[in-house]
Every structure is written in structure tokens, then in C-alpha cells.
């Protein structure tokens, strides 16, 4: 009887396999894939559940769906053109060249951010281009979930009144003309990256952008129905807490994935993230008790978010004591702007920012960026940043200049998002109304989607033909 040799597919032939290149670090690749996945879980189901629970019952479906749609739409835009606009070859000081990230040759090859090579004044290379020890597909995945969560955060300012069709148009336009500019300028090798502005993992690129863009879009869309704006208690605080918990734990991937490697910077970033977040939550809760005599669960969630946001631009470049200080400030300054200043300011009152994204992300993100300019520790900076001898003002030397860079970087992100978001909203409004008609605002989910979050069919509820339309009456469902 003849025998034949067993052929093992290349992918399973150990380290000699074509699927395991010499440059591949399996540990780094595994960590980066896990980090990307938990960041994705922050959005789906994290923010989907949080948005669905924190709004009024009649807007639960619409709010959750705005988040889900944005997550899906960003994926397609990202791999088709937006990834390379953010991290590809340089086109302009603020933009990379638009091209697809779908080719096998690109995706299975070693990851590289070509525009990140940093030169000294004499033209010699100071820092080589970022080249993680895993495939480009991993970087595309990791950065996509960051882009997606940014759009979902913008949605938080617009819940309860923006036309869904307008939102469908807004997502790809804002990703293309706003997010990619911030990402390339600060991370992908643009002018702020090479100037030395520090944004460890998205305080400016993600949170300031989302807070300012959301606030600006909310101005152009207009307010919710008056009765929705006057009183809107969460329809399900436990859902809100579930989404918040996914956010907090998912931030380990958010900030832990920032160095593109499973290294000591990642460990420091994850620890600092939890220190700052816990302190911010406690401070916010204490302020609620002192001024309003009651500890608020929703307030605690807001304090948690401001802590997460504030530490993000600094997580891998500050010491633990600085994370504690940042937590105190993250729990108090955004609390003041949201709970006190907002009620006194006519400008802030005029704009209906549904979930207060301007405060929890815009203010907290800018605060974190500025504090990074104070507390960035030189040794940690040298482990991560392309510009040598970067340090916060607290450490003397060039630290004062660093603080100035942080101010300038924040102002650029604010100005760009105000201008571009306004232009996008004005352009969309030429095609479709930005705001739902009043009759849909009165009803909510049932009028917009023909669905409700808590339709108790088993209790004998009748199918409402005045809302859905029907050829014949529908009998009650018996469960």
C-alpha cells in the first residue's frame, strides 16, 4: 500500500511559515489586536447601550442606531480612502494621500507610518519612521476603531432631533474633512507631530475634535423639542452604567495600545488611566453631594468620562502622582463648566448639546492636553515621542515651550473643527433638512424608525396603524 506525505498548510508550519515573517512580534501583534477589539467594544455595544439608556425612552432606538450606523459607515470610508489620508504618505502638512487600504501586499507587509520620520534642523534623521512589529492590517484595524468612536461621540451632542438621513451624510463628510486632518497633523507625520505637540492617544485628535464638532453641529441643527430639553431623565440608568463600564475597561486598549507595542509605556498608560479616572469620578461625586446634597449616578458617569478623557493625551508620558492631580482637575473643572458656567452663559444655553459632549470631551480633552504640557516627564517622553528632550514645564528646560505648543495645537484643532463642521452642516442643509420635523420630534422612535425600545407586545399592545400604516388590523400578540 502506497503512502503519501502529509502536507501542512503554510500558516501552520510554525515560525518557518510564510505567515510569520522575521519582523513579526507575536506578542505585540496579539496585544494590538486585543487593544483594538476592546476599543471597538467601547463603541459597539458600549456607547450604543449607553446612548440607548441615557436618553428619554422615546429616543432610545434612534440614539443607539446613530451610534451603530456611524461605526459601520466609518469602517467602509476608512479602508476605502480615510486611513491613508490620516497615516499614509504626506500630501500636505495636514493631510496624507487618499488611497485604499485594501491591497494584500500592503496589509500583510510590515506596518509603517511613512510620514513620521523626524529630521533635525540640519536634515539628518533624528527619529526613524514608526514601524511596529506586526502587519499593516493590524494598524488599519486599530486606528479605524479610534475614528469610529470619534464620530459616535459627536453624535452625543445631536441626539433627539437630528435627521437620520442628514446623519448618514454627515458621517463620511466629517470623517474625511475633519478627523483625517487632526489625525495626520498630530499622529501621522503632519506639522504638529514634527513640531512636537504631545497627544499621546487622542485628547486632541479624538476628544477635543468631538466636543467642538458636536457643539458646532448642535448649533446648526438646532435644539430638541422644548419639553424634551426641559426634562430628560435617563430611561434606564442600569444600561447607562453598563455602557459606562465598557468604556472604562475598554480604555485599557484605548491608551494601552497607543505605543503600538506591549511595552513599559503601555503598562504605565493603563495604570495612569485608571488612577485619573477613579479620582475624577470621586471628585465629581463629592462636588455633587456638596452642592446638590445628593450623589448622582449620571454625575459619576460624567466624572468617569472626564477622567478618561483628561488622561488620554498624557497617559504614557506622566508619572502616577501627575495622574492623581489630573484626576482632581478632571473631576472639578468640567464639573464647573457643565453644572455652573453652562447655566450662566447665554451662549452655552443657546446651543442644545444633548449629552454635554462639549464639557465631558471638549473641555476635558483640552484640559488634559494643557496639563500634558506641564507634567510630561522627560524620561517617559524619550521612550515615546519623536522630538528629543520633550518635557513639561514642571521639569524646566524646554518645558515652557512645550506648554506653548500644547496651547497652539489645541487652538488649531478647535478652529479647524468649528470651521469645517459649520461648512459641512451648511452643505448638508442644502440637500436635506438637518433637523427632524416637529411631528416626528413629538413621537420619537416610532415615527422615525417604526420601532420602540420597550414595546410590550405581550401585554396586549395594539399595532398603531396611525404611526406605522397597515392594510389590515393586527391582533394582539399572546405570549
UniProtKB/Swiss-Prot annotation:
Molecular function terms from GO: ammonium channel activity
Aminoacyl-tRNA synthetase recorded as keyword: no
Localization per Swiss-Prot or TrEMBL: Membrane
UniProt cross-references to InterPro entries, sorted A to Z: Ammonium/urea_transptr, Ammonium_transpt, NH4_transpt_AmtB-like_dom, RhesusRHD
Keywords: Ammonia transport, Membrane, Transmembrane, Transmembrane helix, Transport
Cited function: Involved in ammonium transport.
UniProt family annotation: Belongs to the ammonia transporter channel (TC 1.A.11.2) family.
Protein name in UniProt: Ammonium transporter 3 member 2
Organism for this UniProt entry: Oryza sativa subsp. japonica (Rice)
